[in-house]
Each structure stands twice: as C-alpha cells, then as structure tokens.
Amino acid sequence: MITRQYTLKARSLPKVDYHCHINITEYSDPANPTVISVSKEEFIADLKEGGIDKAVILSDRRTTPKQVADFCKQAPERFIGFGYVNPILIGSDEDTRKQREELGLYGLKLYPCSDGYSPDDTHAFKVYEVASELDMPIMFHHAGMPVPYDYLKNTNPAQIDVVAQCFPELKIVLAHLGYPRVDETLYVARKHRNVFCDISWPYGDVNHPSFVYLLWKDLLTALNMGVLDKIVFGTDYPGVRQRPYVDMLMDINRYATHDDLKLPMDRVMNMLDKNIHSHGLVP
C-alpha cells in the first residue's frame, strides 16, 4: 500500500500532467477497439483529486487533432492540446501548421513505432522544421507497445540523438522514459539541451509495489546524470489516474536503504511544475 511520506504543498506554478488522453486507444487493435472515454467533468474531477491544475491532452492514431481541440475548448484554463501527424506522409508539414494556427494545438505527439518510420528519417524533417519555427514541442512515443504492428527499432534513442542535433531549437519530449532503453534515453537528454523526458506509465503493473522501485531507480540514474531537472510528470491518463501516481511520487524514497540514495523531494516535486514551465513546454 502506498502511503505519502511527503506532503504535496502549495506551489506558485500550476502543476501539470504532461501526458493524458481522452480515450484509451494507443494499445487497441484498430479492428477490435477497446475504448474508454472520459467526460470533461470526470477529467477535471480526477485532476482535482490528484492536486493537478492542468493537463496536456494528446492526439493519437485514432483520436484526431480536431477531437482533442474541441475537448480542450471546453476548459481552456485546464487543458492544453497536442496534435498528431505521420511526418513522413506528403502534406504533413502543412497539416502541422494548420493544427497550430487553425485548431490552436500547442504541440505534436508522434508515433514512430506504430506508424512505421524512424524518427531520424529525413522525410520527417519537414515537420520538425515547421514545429521548430512555430515553437511547437514534439512528444515522441518513445517506448514499446504490446501490439503486433509496433516496432521497437523505431524507438531507439540514437535516432533522437540525430534529430536533436539537426534541430537544436526543437523541444523534444521522450515519453515513458524511453522504456526499455531508459539509460540511453537519459543520456540523450544529458547530451542535448532541447531533449526532455516524461515519466508516464513506463512499466507493466502500475499498482504493484515494484513499480515504485523501478521508477525510483530510474530517477536516481537521472539525478546521477544531471538530468533530473529535465524530467516532467505525466500519467498516461485515463490508463493511470493522477492521485495514485502523485501518491507514488510522495513515497518515491521507500526503497532507499541509505540517505545517500534518497531523491531530493523538492526536485522530485519540480517535475510537476518548474521543470515544465521553465523549459517552455507549455504556454
């Protein structure tokens, strides 16, 4: 059972869940979808229960940018929308521009693993150019997905290394800590000032006590590499609700067997707000 060892105190900056959806679609078989939808009221109630002020809502392969934009308009003080394109397709650069200028979406979510391209494919560069020009952060789904059409080879941190080098002004967020290539992902964040990571649902059973241990271990690696301040909070809502994930962070040091192995809680809490706002990852 998770018990809070640290109190979530009032802070000056809005706390943000940087990785949310309005449907569970990422893991669904397109031919046999299993979709759980949430209403605006349910979403806001869950945010309040978790002590979170705002949420980044992501488009994906079957939740359109228009759907996300319309949902965000219901509570613009709470919701920040991200669009979606397949960047190797013709016209995806124009679509990116429209999603920002016409739909009002702030960033993009890309799925190289399931859309079948490498992030460093030069055909995708036209989208990176537009996103960089418009100051649109790009979040990459940077982990495996347990579906037949997913290819782990397209979530290699070495590919992001190339993109970050070619587009130094492009803000890149690597979702799920790059699991299972966590250490390599953190190293890319260390190498490039424009690369960040979120901690959304990177492992199997989020309700198992070992989940806290795995996240603690990876955040300790981030601390050692000097990139803990480039890690941002995210849940993968509605798959994971905000309250239990925040509770887990409050108890993140439960497996630290020595004071030297404890994560500094003020910097852990920065993942919810300061790390997001100070790097311009939200408006």
Annotate each predicted stretch with a short phrase:
Residues 14, 19-25, 141, 176:
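Histidine-centered divalent metal-coordination motifs
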Residues 106-107, 120-232:
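Catalytic pocket-lining loop regions of alpha/beta-barrel enzymes
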Residues 21-38, 147, 207:
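Acidic/histidine-rich helix-loop elements
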Residues 62-155:
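Active-site gating/metal-coordination segments in enzymes
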Residues 19, 47, 68, 108, ...:
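Conserved, mostly hydrophobic/aromatic
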Residues 35-46, 89-100, 182:
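Short, acidic/polar
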